[in-house]
Amino acid sequence: MAPVTSKKSKSVKKFVVDVAAPVENDVFDQESYVKYLVEHVKVDGIVGNLGNDISITAESDNKVVVVVSGNGSFSGKYLKYLTKKYLKKNQIRDWIRFVSVKQNQYKLQFYAVAEDDEEEEDEE
């Protein structure tokens, strides 16, 4: 009996990063984030070698979409790593965090800052 060879269909993964909150507060630049991702994504060990497997685009509704098709290897952890590097480079890592909303959907949101009412009362 001949071995059965299965042909893997080319899977398409889509990662969506919602950057609406920081963009609305003029803290985050969506275009520079997309440019950073394009320049720093590694494919086959080469930085910036996206080819036809990976496309990174910015949508008008404050979302960045990373589409991986074919044999492109890309994970959510790698996207999180690159985003954290971008935030650290632009010195906004202390205020914004990268949060997973659903599978392959992420969001940049501000850290929750609890206002200390007790300190305000003590000062009065």
UniProtKB/Swiss-Prot annotation:
Gene Ontology MF annotations: RNA binding; structural constituent of ribosome
Protein role: Component of the ribosome, a large ribonucleoprotein complex responsible for the synthesis of proteins in the cell. The small ribosomal subunit (SSU) binds messenger RNAs (mRNAs) and translates the encoded message by selecting cognate aminoacyl-transfer RNA (tRNA) molecules. The large subunit (LSU) contains the ribosomal catalytic site termed the peptidyl transferase center (PTC), which catalyzes the formation of peptide bonds, thereby polymerizing the amino acids delivered by tRNAs into a polypeptide chain.
Species assigned in the record: Candida albicans (strain SC5314 / ATCC MYA-2876) (Yeast)
Gene: RPL22B
Domain of life the protein comes from: Eukaryota
Listed Pfam families: Ribosomal_L22e
Protein name, as recorded: Large ribosomal subunit protein eL22
GO term, biological process aspect, one: cytoplasmic translation
Classification via PANTHER family: 60S RIBOSOMAL PROTEIN L22, LARGE RIBOSOMAL SUBUNIT PROTEIN EL22A-RELATED
Alphabetic keyword roster: Cytoplasm, Ribonucleoprotein, Ribosomal protein
Cellular localisation: Cytoplasm
Sequence similarity: Belongs to the eukaryotic ribosomal protein eL22 family.
Quaternary context: Component of the large ribosomal subunit. Mature ribosomes consist of a small (40S) and a large (60S) subunit. The 40S subunit contains about 32 different proteins and 1 molecule of RNA (18S). The 60S subunit contains 45 different proteins and 3 molecules of RNA (25S, 5.8S and 5S).
Example of a GO cellular component annotation carried by this entry: cytoplasm
